[in-house]
């Protein structure tokens, strides 16, 4: 994560330096409106840069996942980049609007309008088209900004269900394209040919490609596999579904701790941790009833039911270089189930596994005990319905 943060700060620094280079007279100026123009451009370019990176991070590309060291970390970065872009967008909007409000209150004098390019008759081609398109670009940018606020607030609202959440992210790609068009038209003419111009155009091209890639439904397309339900078992005590699926085409394999998206007909894809090590074309999942999709899922299943699997993703690291303590709560035991399978063929330093649950699933606990014994893992099962919650003192005493 620190590597990604460092890279992002370097990019922000480069953008800042190139913007300063493109504004040679700004820092010696006392003209409020010259500063306003520079700040509007700078905040807009930075917001566009972050939005472009957020679009790229959402594509689940293998190269991006390697860079972020896991798609889960990538999505966390994606979230905070999106929030930062919105804050810069608000600064961009305020830098443009506040002087207008002060002029309307007669606290500022409206400056003479200078376009810096001479009479319109001297403009031709692209420059003339861009000038004529400015009013439309202003409207597009303003409404795109309002839409971005609404979509981001909705997507961050914890009470929102999964389908509306996915819809907001699909619409964000459309909003990005509108903001990109706004940026192309309104990027200051004085920047043309400068390094800041070409860097901004690069961000726009990359971000627009990512937005179109998403809108065309290409995200994860190369990692999708047809499959069917092989077996399933539901434990009412823990409200957990133990699902085994059979892939209908060769699976390229996965590492312990990775996850995949499951998509049933008429449903959106949902991510679940794979609860087994690589074992041919079968995958196992432990699914807790937590939301509108997972609640009652066992009642909608039948052996042979078709679904689509996308993955694997994630960079969960079961390092064997030092002793480890594994702690899994409820279905959070899934990656450690895969880890126990993995230890069947790997040598490791001592491992102590704590499994915390509320009301034990007898079948799952029996399986855990059997596998832990086979691979020499110390196992402690804590049922919070009868046992005290696990504490740091408990861990220190047992390990």
Predicted region positions:
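FNR/FR-type flavoprotein reductase catalytic core
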Residues: 3-13, 19-25, 44, 48-51, ...
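Membrane-interface interhelical loops and short amphipathic "cap" helices
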Residues: 25-38
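N-terminal low-hydrophobic presequence detector
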Residues: 33-35, 265, 332
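Ferredoxin-reductase
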Residues: 217-305, 352, 356-359, 384-386
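Structured alpha-helical
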Residues: 54
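Interfacial loop-to-helix transition and helix-capping segments at the boundaries
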Residues: 35-42, 49
């Amino acid at each position: 994560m620190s590597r990604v943060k460092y890279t992002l700060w370097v990019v922000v620094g480069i953008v800042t330096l190139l913007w300063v280079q493109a504004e040679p007279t700004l820092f010696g100026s006392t003209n409020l409106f010259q500063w306003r123009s520079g700040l509007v451009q700078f905040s807009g370019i930075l917001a566009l840069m972050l939005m472009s990176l957020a679009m790229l991070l959402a594509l689940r590309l293998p190269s991006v996942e390697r860079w972020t060291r896991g798609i889960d970390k990538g999505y966390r970065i994606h979230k905070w980049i999106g929030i930062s872009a919105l804050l810069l967008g608000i600064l961009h909007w305020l830098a443009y609007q506040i002087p207008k409000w002060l002029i309307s209150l007669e606290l500022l004098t409206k400056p003479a309008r200078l376009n810096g390019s001479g009479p319109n008759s001297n403009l031709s081609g692209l420059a003339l088209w861009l000038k004529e398109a400015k009013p439309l670009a202003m409207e597009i940018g303003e409404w795109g900004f309002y839409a971005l606020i609404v979509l981001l607030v909705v997507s961050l609202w914890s009470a929102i269900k999964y389908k509306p959440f996915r819809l907001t992210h699909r619409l964000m790609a459309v909003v990005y394209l509108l903001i990109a068009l706004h940026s192309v038209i309104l990027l200051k003419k004085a920047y043309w040919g400068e390094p800041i111009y070409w860097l901004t155009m690069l961000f726009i091209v990359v971000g627009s490609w990512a937005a179109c890639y998403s809108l065309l439904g290409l995200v994860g397309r190369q990692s999708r596999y047809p499959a069917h339900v092989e077996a399933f078992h539901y434990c009412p005590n823990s409200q957990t579904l133990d699902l085994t699926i059979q892939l209908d085409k060769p699976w390229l394999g996965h590492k312990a701790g990775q996850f995949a998206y499951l998509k049933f007909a008429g449903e959106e894809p949902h991510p679940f941790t794979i609860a087994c090590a690589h074992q041919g074309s079968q995958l196992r999942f432990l699914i807790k009833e937590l939301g509108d999709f997972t609640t009652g899922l066992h009642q909608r299943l039948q052996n042979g039911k078709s679904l689509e699997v996308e993955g694997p993703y994630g960079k969960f690291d079961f390092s064997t270089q030092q002793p480890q303590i594994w702690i899994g709560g409820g279905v959070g035991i899934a990656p450690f189930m895969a880890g126990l399978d993995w230890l069947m063929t790997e040598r490791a330093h001592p491992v102590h596994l704590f499994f915390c649950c509320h009301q034990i699933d007898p079948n799952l606990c029996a399986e855990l005990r059997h596998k832990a014994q086979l691979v020499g893992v110390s196992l402690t099962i804590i049922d919070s319905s009868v046992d005290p919650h696990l504490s740091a003192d408990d861990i220190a005493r047992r390990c």
